[in-house]
Every structure is written in structure tokens, then in C-alpha cells.
Design a protein with these regions (language model features):
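A glycine/threonine-rich phosphate-anchoring loop and its flanking beta-alpha core
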Residues: 1-77, 166-169
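Short glycine/threonine-rich catalytic loop with a Thr-x-Gly-x-Asp
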Residues: 55-60, 79, 83, 141-146
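Gly/Pro-rich interdomain helix-loop hinge
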Residues: 138-141, 145-208
Length: 242
């Protein structure tokens, strides 16, 4: 298996996971080392034609991977270092990748951030992905990276109580102090990139929250979030991301 990515977000060219969409719309994730490509050819020039909105959404998928991996409760210092470096690269270059699509330096660093996020998330992800996997099964087909961008601010706020030092390490990359300021910085980044301000803009209303929370509790990423969320916690995070 040879993988040649044409976006910079998922990082599946170095990952051992796959997603199957079931007949009822649910997304089933599974892992196998047999899924890891033998060779990954990561050429940033293949992303030059990616439209700005898709560049932004896939780029924020990479950001979410790096943040959630870094905050995950599993102990893996090498993975943390890779994720942290990937986040630094993404934040330095995502704006330019969106505004200057043929800027090779920006595209190269976003492709690296994407790959690094996936290399590191073998450690585990968290509540952002528990929710986005559940939301991704909706008939309207919301984009995974866009969902992650919208959900990330409230999830980092929720997780601060469990891992305050790690949340501050992420906040340091954004140049702010504390989870509240970090959440605001992520929202500001989403705004600059032209992404939705909340779930409502994506057609996702409060009537869906309870069912989404139920599915999030069953997701494989739920167990590796640094602070275990209850059904009510998930509903609250969705409401705060509206």
C-alpha cells in the first residue's frame, strides 16, 4: 500500500486506523497495523489546488489531532513532542496556506503538521473526536475537520480541570494564558480562516444534542480524553459550541 495525500489534515498516510460508514450512518473506527501504508509520498505541491475552505478545514483537523493527542491521558512523551511540534508548525503556517495556496513553505509545513498529528495520535484522541465522529454520521454530512474546529474550544476548556499544565502548554503556543483565553484564540483562528462560528451555522440544532451525546459515549476516543465526560458534559459542550 502506497499513500499519496492530497490534503493536509487527516494524516492517514501514516496511521493505522480506518473508518467504515455503516448502513445506518454510524461511523465505526478500527485499528490494524496492516492498514499502515508501506510508503507515504508527501508532496506539498499536490495540495496547491486545494480550495481555501477545504485547506482551512483540513488544517484545523491537523490542529485538533495535535492538541488532543498532547492532552490525551496516555503517557507517551515522544508522541507529545511530535504533536507539540506539529501544532507549532500548523499555527505558524495555516493562515498563509489559506491565503496563499501555492506558497510551498506554508503547504510543506501544513503537510508535516498533518503527518505529525497522525503519527502521534496512535496515543489516543479525545472528546472532540468522540463528538465529531457522532456528528459526522448525520444525514447532512458535516465536514469532519470543520466539526473539529468548532468543537475544539469548548473541549479544551472542559479538559483544563484535569490537565491544567498541558492546557497551558498548548495556550503558550497560541501566546495566551489559561483555557478560557485559549478557547477564545481558537475561535478567533476559526473566524480568520472563514470557518463557521458554531454548530448552528452547520445546520446542527439543540434537538440533536442528546442523541449525539449518547453516541459520543460509545466512541473509541471517549476513553482517552483526559477528563472523562458524562452524557450531560457532552450536551453542555455541544450547547457551548452552538
Amino acid at each position: 500500500l502506497i499513500a499519496i495525500p492530497t490534503t493536509a489534515g487527516t494524516g492517514s498516510e501514516v496511521a493505522r486506523g480506518a473508518i467504515i460508514i455503516l448502513d445506518d450512518g454510524r461511523k465505526l473506527g478500527f485499528h490494524s497495523w496492516h492498514l499502515v501504508p508501506k510508503t507515504a509520498i508527501c508532496d506539498p505541491e499536490l495540495t496547491f489546488g486545494l480550495p481555501p475552505k477545504l485547506t482551512a478545514a483540513t488544517g484545523m483537523d491537523a490542529v485538533a489531532h495535535c492538541v488532543e493527542t498532547f492532552l490525551s491521558k496516555a503517557v507517551n512523551p515522544p508522541a507529545d513532542a511530535i504533536a507539540h511540534d506539529g501544532l507549532v508548525r500548523a499555527l505558524r503556517h495555516i493562515d498563509r496556506a489559506v491565503s496563499e495556496p501555492t506558497n510551498r513553505e506554508a503547504r510543506w509545513n501544513m503537510m508535516s503538521a498533518s503527518m505529525q498529528g497522525a503519527m502521534a495520535f496512535q496515543k489516543g484522541l479525545g472528546a472532540v473526536h468522540s463528538l465529531s465522529h457522532a456528528l459526522g454520521a448525520l444525514p447532512i454530512g458535516p465536514h469532519h475537520g470543520t466539526l473539529n474546529a468548532v468543537l475544539l474550544p469548548e473541549v479544551v476548556r472542559f479538559n483544563e480541570a484535569a490537565v491544567p499544565e498541558k492546557v497551558q502548554a498548548i495556550a503558550d503556543v497560541f501566546g495566551v494564558r489559561g483555557g478560557v483565553a485559549l478557547a477564545a484564540s481558537i475561535r478567533d483562528l476559526n473566524r480568520r480562516l472563514g470557518l463557521p462560528a458554531g454548530l448552528g451555522e452547520m445546520g446542527i440544532g439543540p434537538d440533536l444534542y442528546a442523541d449525539i451525546a449518547t453516541h459520543a459515549l460509545k466512541d473509541h476516543c471517549h476513553a482517552t480524553n483526559p477528563r472523562i465526560a458524562s452524557h450531560a458534559d457532552y450536551v453542555d459542550m455541544l450547547a457551548a459550541s452552538a
